[in-house]
């Protein structure tokens, strides 16, 4: 009973501490941007930003904001995860207690905020529950007894090759998505460097001094993951839009009457070079193919050795490796498509109700350019591995045949040489010995004659 009560207390502490640290940090930064003291308006704005980071947007008289700052969401989930691991609130009782407290705090924020919320009460609380649950599960599931029992069961019931195939499939999906996001970050940096003059012009137009510019730039970073995802879609051919006012692709970059928001100053121009457009469009295919080939041939992957087809005993494992790699590639392509759909959907939002009602990417089009190219790249990697092995087999067979034919042709010649060497090694008889052999021999008669 004491253990259960302890878990309830720990769960409540996790929820209270997480919200306190998170809300106080946001409130201090908001006050730093708006004034020296925490005011009623700052507190309400902080509460609205907390709800916004959980996916619940708000509206004012001048604009509507529903673009979830994904960097804040990631930090909030990480904070919940870290406190759960620190306090060791892993049990289901801790989760229930923490979730109740967390929902209570979010409901208090929802009722106290002076800004109009876009979502209904049940949807606000549902999104808050999802955020807390993700943070809790990321910390508790790996440490739970049921997960350890499940891992033990899979080790006993599931063959090692299948488990390895599933692990490689998930690892490939994570690796390829990480590379795509890194490329998106690099693209955003390139945009910022190339278009910094436009950002400076927007700062000057808004009348911001150096301090305000720094604080505004830092505040804009909370949407960095969103812009990274837009950059991935733009680079791979999907593009993105700022409502009805602007559309950006590799071929098109037009805008009209965009709001004077500094972050809009970094948005890209169309790429004029046909070569660079081709490179960008084929980048996901090349990345997936390269990662797939590494997974097939590296020892940490499927360790496929084409030269093993020379021996009948080692030929079977090579074919088995190809079969399992095909399964892993299918799993990776499916996971990447699902993850891309979810991430692109989360990155979208709105800044208004009319011309700025939709800001972000076309989810289906962006998922198609990413998922389709990735699947083609993984398929190309598997086919290249198959073709390589198929080429090695006839080459090895031909080399062995040539060796056999050379050995067969060399055997009679070798026998003739050995015979000649044998005859040459015999001692030669002298002329006297030969004459003695040919002289008549005198033998004594028996004395018997014919009558």
What role is predicted for each listed range?
Residues 87-127, 258-279, 295-351, 416, ...:
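Hydrophobic alpha-helical transmembrane segments of integral membrane proteins
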Residues 449-451:
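Intrinsically disordered terminal tails
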Residues 2-78, 111-114, 203-285, 345-427, ...:
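Long, glycine/tryptophan/cysteine-rich extracytoplasmic
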Residues 1-9, 78-92, 135-170, 193, ...:
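Cytoplasmic membrane-interface segments at the C-terminal ends of transmembrane helices
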Residues 21-29, 80-84, 105-112, 134-142, ...:
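Alpha-helical membrane-inserting segments
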Residues 1-24, 83-95, 121-130, 163-181, ...:
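Alpha-helical transmembrane segments and their helix-start/interface "positive-inside/aromatic belt" motifs
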Residues 13-17, 21, 72, 76, ...:
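Hydrophobic faces of alpha-helical transmembrane segments in multi-pass integral membrane proteins
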Residues 83-178, 185-214:
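Membrane-interface helix-loop-helix junctions at boundaries between adjacent transmembrane segments
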